[in-house]
Amino acid sequence: MPATAKQKLRAKRLAQLKRFLREHTWGVMITVLIMIALILFVCVIAGATPKEASAPETTQDETPRYESGFICAITTQVPYYTEELSEAGTVARGMQITYSTDRSVERDGVRYYLTYFSTLDCGYVSEENLTQDPSAVIAEKVVYVRTPQNLRLDKNTLELGTLVEKGTELQVLSYEGTTDGVVDLYQVSYQGQTGYISGQYVSTVQEEANDVYDRFGVYAIHAGRGDKWGGGDAESLDYFPRTKASFADNKMPNPCYAIYLTCDPAILKDIDKYIEYAKTTKINAFVVNIMDGTSIGYNSPVYEEYSPTAYQYANNTVEEYQAVIQKIKDAGFYAIGRLTTFNDSFFCQDHPEYAIADGSGDSLYVAASYWPSAFCRYVWEYKVALAIDAVQTMGFDEIQFDYMRFPDGTWAFEEGTIDYRNENGESKAQSVQRFLMYACDRLHDAGVYVSADVFGECAEAYVTAYGQYWPAISNVVDAISAMPYPDHYGASGDW
């Protein structure tokens, strides 16, 4: 085409474009604005500004955008913030997280990184509470005892060491695990002895450890109840709230209707009849004796170690007793193993050094039995070892401690003619409650519940002479059973 013709065609098209723009000016402007808005929207969704989008790509030598790590602190909970550094909530220390190294804000010389707790939850966390070292999750070097406890000498055994009192400072050596920020088990040092203590019994702040729990004035109710009958005062017991155990694979019936069976072979041989009968009623659980004083359920190896006499007089073999409990569980019933705690003549025969004694040092026969002292930790270890063996060997869902007390009827001996083997200077009620804490800790680790049988009297507004006090016991165990006997309601009106 000749040059003149091309110029004429170009001029014609330019004239047409100018005419189109004059006629559609607003439409063109709106279209351009929409395109700009779309570009900005895409940038916001992508988490970057237009300036960031045009930034050069990150090289391998630059800091990566994300790092894996853990929440660390001296406290159980750590705050996280909005981008404006307003507090938005808390997370438990020990949580595994991911944080962005190039999205942070700074205030007062402290940098806060955008931290992801899950796919959807995030917030800004102080650099002081982020670590890539799992051993650095727990920052405290000392803890203070809030609830008096005996240190465990070994994390994997039942042996107990020194009793550490409220407010005692313990040096932290290491720790194992956290649950909602609370340490499962500290390894600590105290007066040259190394041991272990649960994080639920200590505080990182001495003032908090020494404080008495009194929310809603609860403690004040007990503080005025002194030592009326020799069992101790209510003020010295522990009322700090404990979370009751709950196991996904072991549901406690609610309500629980149980039938009780002794461990006599003449009873257990008819287990099929009892199961068939239970199916016709509301019964959903069986209570079976592991031991009842000198009536021994089966020849557990625990008896061989702690009480050979009990082993010798076992009513059933392991296999015979095991078959009974298995039938109960196969039929869909909840299985509760009952054992007498501080009523045990066989043990006192084997270990008179741990028995409650008279003034001359001989084992004291009270209420048709000899009684191991509830003050003696070796007795605690024995009974909890037996309970754990019953859980592991027989498959019980719950352990029920009966005779979980000192003998009643000892008033005549209290004036210097009785030796309770009280090496720690505790009250009766303190030793009973502390035993149950120890038992619950170890049996909960085994995945079962713990219950206690008590006299109905212990619900009165005083600590009983034999060391039972309902509020202190019920604060620890998962279930509590008062024992109202039929003869309490006799026509004579004696009760």
Language-model features, listed with the residues they occupy:
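Boundary regions of SH3-family modules and the immediately adjacent low-complexity/disordered segments
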Residues: P56-Y66, Y116-V143, S189-K244
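SH3/SH3-like (including bacterial SH3b) beta-barrel domains
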Residues: Y81-R93, L153-K166
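SH3/SH3-like beta-barrel superfamily modules
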Residues: A92-S126, E165-Q200
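Catalytic domains of carbohydrate-active enzymes, especially glycoside hydrolases
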Residues: I271-I296, V391-E398, A479
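Aromatic-lined carbohydrate-recognition surfaces of secreted/lumenal glycan-active proteins
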Residues: Y334-D344, Q400-P407, K428-A465
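Substrate-binding cleft/loops of secretory-pathway carbohydrate-active enzymes
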Residues: Y449-Y489
